[in-house]
Regions:
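Structured-RNA-binding interfaces characteristic of tRNA pseudouridine synthases
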Residues: 1-165
């Protein structure tokens, strides 16, 4: 519901936001406390089963195994013969409190890849949680946020005052 435009640029007429991106980053926020923070619950999933640092360490280990180029057909909702080989550049897992005076524990998983298949971010999160907690958990889409998209500099059109080489 809340979208903020931080910047904009004039681009080529041939620019396609979905095809010209070089990387996309998704953020998945999980409240691991039994009771969710009422101020952040609209944008945070609640999975109170993740409680120990050893489980978070197991999630980190599973995340490390996904970094690189892999065929993600099994971790997507793709039914058509679309290219399923994608490269994950980085997966970071952090476990903290939402604020210093807060008793709510927050697990944040950030996934950066060259591209994502349909439902791939959710299935990656479910895979990581299964490896860490050894329990099947369905991803609540409330915790998934598109954090950023990176485009090459060549997509921008030079401004009227600049010289084109």
């Amino acid at each position: 519901k809340d979208i903020h435009i931080l910047s904009s640029e004039i681009v080529s007429d041939r620019f396609r936001s979905d095809l010209n991106a070089v990387s996309r980053t998704y953020l998945y926020r999980i409240c691991t406390a039994p009771v969710q923070n009422i101020f952040t619950r609209a944008y945070t999933a609640n999975i109170p089963e993740i409680i120990s640092e050893s489980e978070v360490a197991a999630i980190r280990k599973a995340a490390d195994s996904l970094v690189g180029v892999h065929d993600f057909r099994s971790l997507s909702g793709v039914k058509k013969k679309k290219g399923t080989v994608k490269e994950i550049f980085d997966i970071s897992v952090s476990h903290s409190k939402e604020t210093e005076n807060d008793s709510f524990s927050l697990l944040t998983i950030k996934i950066c890849a060259n591209d994502f298949l349909y439902l791939m971010p959710e299935h990656i999160i479910e895979f990581l949680i299964k490896k860490g907690v050894d329990k099947e958990v369905r991803c609540n889409p409330a915790g998934l946020l598109l954090h950023s998209i990176t485009y090459p500099d060549s997509c921008s059109v030079p401004s009227a005052g600049s010289k084109q080489v």
